[in-house]
């Protein structure tokens, strides 16, 4: 046993974590009227609240949607995909319906499968959210693991992430192609969005866990998505030992996020996500939710000050700097877009973009 190996049956063992006995849909609790606040990470909630509170930032995003339009965006995402239904990908459809029921989502959002070996999924849209599932994910994961991924994406929808995630995807594509409006200002917005985007993944990991109600399933899915191996080739307990190494230093997680900013990564490392999710479980919040102790949809939402207060314990200075950078970059980006539009209209024979 190495210094990171968990003792058998101890707190680091997946078998000992709360909720382990809830594997399999027959025994899962339906979380009636559960509010997304139940699973949202304080840093994600505060950052998103801050983004929504900056009018110029939201204006920039909606102007981009005005330029491209929601329908063309939907078609672009769905052009090479198949919509899931009882007759198309019936296995995926059945698993998805169970997730919708467990999380008591208001409705089943359109779900598509796209042919690509890359193991991934995403939730996109503006007023009409939809979920896109890569075929590589469908092939790699077993039923429970796939339900974790589906619940994760439903969590993004219910938390109101899809508008910003869609804009993130568009801006990344524009940046890669050197589109005229994507200069330093837009890249500043990208950095700010990336910071929130990664925090939002931590929230949806919690939603994914609530959708399957078995930590072992989540850790196994993350392990497969990190390494691509089969159950015979990998061992969950050793993967958890990797995650334990990330908890040896209080400052390491923040350092990892800073490195990811430099690398331009959209997702935190899976080992870091395992560590974050285990920390949340150990607070008792997960068990309380399964006992029915959670905020309901329709309950009064906490105020802005309270939202910031939750995050301030570990995130206050970082969040303040984050919002300031977003506000400054968004103003510059707005001016850049408007100037580009004016230049397009002023050119003879050109009707704008």
Language-model features: locations:
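Catalytic Zn2+-binding segment of zinc metalloproteases
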Residues: 154-173
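Short pre-active-site segment immediately N-terminal to the catalytic Zn-binding motif
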Residues: 83-87, 91, 132-148, 192-198
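Alpha-helical membrane-targeting segments
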Residues: 53-72, 167-193, 250-264
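Extracytoplasmic and endomembrane cell-envelope/extracellular-matrix remodeling and assembly machinery
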Residues: 224-265, 276-307
